Amino acid sequence: MLALQDSPARRFLQGLGSRLARPKAIAVVSAHWETSGGPAVSLATLPATIHDFGGFPRALYEIQYRAPGAPELAEQAAALFEAAGIAVGRSAERGLDHGAW
């Protein structure tokens, strides 16, 4: 399991961040965030870590991914969708599911 066990892939990903410029934000599209009215953006300033899975080692449920949100950029993204005629929901409560972290 990549998140818990040492492997060449995990070591590569751990070192990758120091070799890349720090982004202002990262857009994540998640199939785990279902809404009834189309796409939605998260306006959370510090999204919670959501453990939306079952049957894995306890250590996986203890991982906390403390990535800052970017509400201003999320609003800009929502505005672009709306300018294209696509209604967009907004949520300040939604956290990051395991597809994101």
Where are these regions (language model features)?
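A short aromatic-anchored loop/beta-hairpin motif
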Residues: M1-L80, A84
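Internal, conserved structured core segments that host functional sites
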Residues: L73-W101
